[in-house]
Amino acid sequence: MILASCIAVALLPLAASAQVDDAGILIDHVWSGHPVGFNLLTERGHQFIAYYDADRRLTLIGRKLGEAGSTRVQPEGVPVPKRKRTSNTLGWDSHNFLEMALDRDGYLHLSGNMHRDPLVYYRTRQPFDVSTLERVDRMTGELENEVTYPHFFKNERGDLMFRYRDGGSGKGSDYYNIYDERSREWTRLIEGSLLDGEGVRNAYSSGPVRSPDGNYHMVWMWRDTSDAATNHTLSYAYSRDLIHWQTSARKALELPITIKTGEVIDDARPGEGLINMAFNIGFDAESHPIVSYHRYDAEGHSQAYVARPDSRGNWLIRSLSDWDFRWGFSGGGSINGEVRLGSPVLTDEGAMMLNYSTKAAGGGRWYFDSDTLVLLPPPSREPEASESKVALNYAGSNYPGMQSKSVSSTSEEGRWVLRWETLGKNRDHPREVIPPPAELRLYKIF
């Protein structure tokens, strides 16, 4: 394992108090030529922000809450010949989001800027100290040359996990690693992949998501090629320990899970409207899974569906929408989402709630019964979005086409929102005209 130290360490002034005014904290000016996910992590009295600066350089800021000042680092990278850039510099790909996590001992782990690229991974030498960030050239050292969709999360014991896809759209498999703080080494959680495309497809998964009763649930769809229209076969599995998986009817699944072995929620075929940008999972009062997703109806219109299993593994499916438009998508590259569906959420009154937004019909929320999935009237007083105050106080630019983006972080110290602006997705292709940098601001939600 080769370790390389970070460069460009700077101490920056930052508000000492956790009480932030309506204008927020100006963090930096950032790249706005296309959207890509930044990351905000607030945990154990510390806060970390990972983003791409105005020059598209990977940048990390760390601070201790309640103290003045922060530390800003720009870790070094290595050449990525096929991209004609370095691994710490962003190209034009909207897949190249950033992921962070703290392990039990407070060491920060950072990964991202990959779309079928060699693993990009950094780790600090000291707990909570971003100035000690180092590049680590491998995790397990196996199948790490075509990495996409990095994701850190914790299992029920608090072990740090890392999920990623090896390969590409139409030809990829999902792998899971587990971290040992004592040895500072990663190993495979299971032998081989969890979701296996068998060399002719790949899975796009939502999850694993932990339900209130402690189980992990995963929903995915298969895709045959890089063409987004070839998504099909919405599927489901759950596990207590992320190692042994089963269907909703408690039938054990042999690993890896393939298209032949996974439990099917909706057998939608290619071209029938399944899209990996619009599906999620939530839970009712008894921790039963409820899945939200987009597909076309019999007339070819876009609709929002919800589904839930019974004890025998039969899925009840119901449409919540009655739209008369069609979100027609196809081709490769990052596309702009015209339908967004949240995770089904259990309300205090016992109903399920689902937020949605569309380009053609606006947005809103539905309320529905958790057992029958039948629509219910909204309550007399609906909850307000916690970010509404932030939305009113972000002074956006006048540059044509700019969109507001945000990411939030909630911990014992409160809720924070990181907000910036960017142009929309461009199929991962360069633009002829580069817009000016955008403000990156941090807000405390009271």
What is each model feature region?
Residues 14-18:
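Sec/Tat signal peptide C-region and signal peptidase I cleavage site
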Residues 4-13:
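Bacterial N-terminal signal peptides
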Residues 19-446:
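Extracellular, repeat-based ectodomains that mediate carbohydrate processing or recognition
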